[in-house]
Amino acid sequence: MKYRDLRDFLSLLEQRGELKRISQPIDPYLEMTEIADRTLRAGGPALLFENPKGYNMPVLCNLFGTAKRVAMGMGQEDVSALRDVGKLLAFLKEPDPPKGFRDLFDKLPKFKQVLNMPTKCLSSAPCQEQVWEGEDVDLSRIPVMHCWPEDAAPLVSWGLTVTRGPHKERQNLGIYRQQVLGKNKLIMRWLSHRGGALDYQEWCEAHPGERFPVAVALGADPATILAAVTPVPDTLSEYAFAGLLRGHKTEVVKCLSNSLEVPASAEIVLEGYIEQGEMAPEGPYGDHTGYYNEIDSFPVFTVTHITQRKDAIYHSTYTGRPPDEPAVMGVALNEVFVPILQKQFPEIVDFYLPPEGCSYRLAVVTIKKQYAGHAKRVMMGVWSFLRQFMYTKFVIVCDDDINARDWNDVIWAITTRMDPSRDTVLIENTPIDYLDFASPVSGLGSKMGLDATNKWPAETPREWGRPIKMDEEVRARVDAIWDELAIFSDKETKR
């Protein structure tokens, strides 16, 4: 599925009945959240609020409100096809050496695909059709949503933040929420291990006292947004990967006030800087946990320029108790993660992040167990292999006869194959999401691994139970007479 920018993607959604235009005046203060939340929970379409109260700019919500639309944003027609995206990433992350000339020939298309996707830098771009700078900069022109009653202020939620470290050629793209602080100021809430925060830290060390350039793209195309939250190999830029997803090179343009490159088709771009040492208290905000988070200090982003397309669209979302857009995206991106994990740990059969677990806080893994202690090795691997799982608090490991996506199966395995003392792994003082108020210290907490696999002789001296299973000949005989028994009126009742 190919598209060029957000508007092109919205046209495709509308053709397929996946976009609903709302012409009634709707308030960005709370009302949009309530409508978007009800729509998402019902599996409904993306929403384009054409007449936000008090504004002349339409607001787009629920763009990634179903796993299918996430897949479409990644250039695929179906969620199952995201496994192929994961396989490509796994290959690029750690290419296998060719086993011979024929194998090398077979691998060439993958390398050619990547080499053909560098960015294309334009001299002018749609995102700079209109420009405000200096005293004309006013964030109140943008219909930024105020999502929950006790939120501190309106919150920019889909800001694609572009930074570059002082010793890096490659830019970093990250999605960080930003509290509106004034007409030209926002609070940049990035966690210390995120790419933007690391770039800023390195800048402060290399250039003490100098302003750190930042750009934020609002309304970038879906492929670029999704590339920013996907485990792209360090050797591949998010822009190049976005080009692979959408089927053509990512077009960028240099900012007017600095050398950062932003998506040329973005609806709105905020340019500016962070003054070293300028911090402000951020929050509280209703978050993806379903709770308001505590207040903490983060850097202040000063906006010097606002550039935008004519008739710009503001792309927004809300976060709350699952399901919300992050949870839905987690379900879809789960399919991308599986091949990447299997590349490193071939014994993994399936990997599942239940949306009820706030996108990433709990993982269920099924494996082909090969030796005593195998489950514990897999736990450690999940926590350490991808940055996306460093905040996963609970990892449940089961055998491959268990369906990782069926809680009936998983709970049965936990309650019948686990001893709480022997099969529970607790690790203290590990990195934890700052938003996790249950941890004893902000940003630092514990992790739990549950080994719900069948135990091997080295793991228990007791004889292990054998699963109950009906004789296959008896099942076949009953199958043959089942309909005649007419026990249920519904003939489609499962046998």
Curated annotation (Swiss-Prot):
GO terms for biological process: ubiquinone biosynthetic process. Its EC number is 4.1.1.98. Binds 1 prenylated FMN per subunit. Pfam families: UbiD, UbiD_C, UbiD_N. The active site is at residue 287. One of its GO terms (cellular component) is cytosol. Its cofactor is prenylated FMN; Mn(2+). It is found in: Cell membrane. Prenylated FMN binds at residues 175-177, 189-191, 194-195. It is a peripheral membrane protein. Mn(2+) binds at residues 172, 238. Its main location: membrane. Pathway: Cofactor biosynthesis; ubiquinone biosynthesis. Keywords: Cell membrane, Decarboxylase, Flavoprotein, FMN, Lyase, Manganese, Membrane, Metal-binding, Ubiquinone biosynthesis. Catalyzes the decarboxylation of 3-octaprenyl-4-hydroxy benzoate to 2-octaprenylphenol, an intermediate step in ubiquinone biosynthesis. NCBIfam families: PRK10922.1, UbiD family decarboxylase. Homohexamer. HAMAP family: UbiD (MF_01636). Belongs to the UbiD family. This is 3-octaprenyl-4-hydroxybenzoate carboxy-lyase. It comes from Yersinia enterocolitica serotype O:8 / biotype 1B (strain NCTC 13174 / 8081). The gene is ubiD.
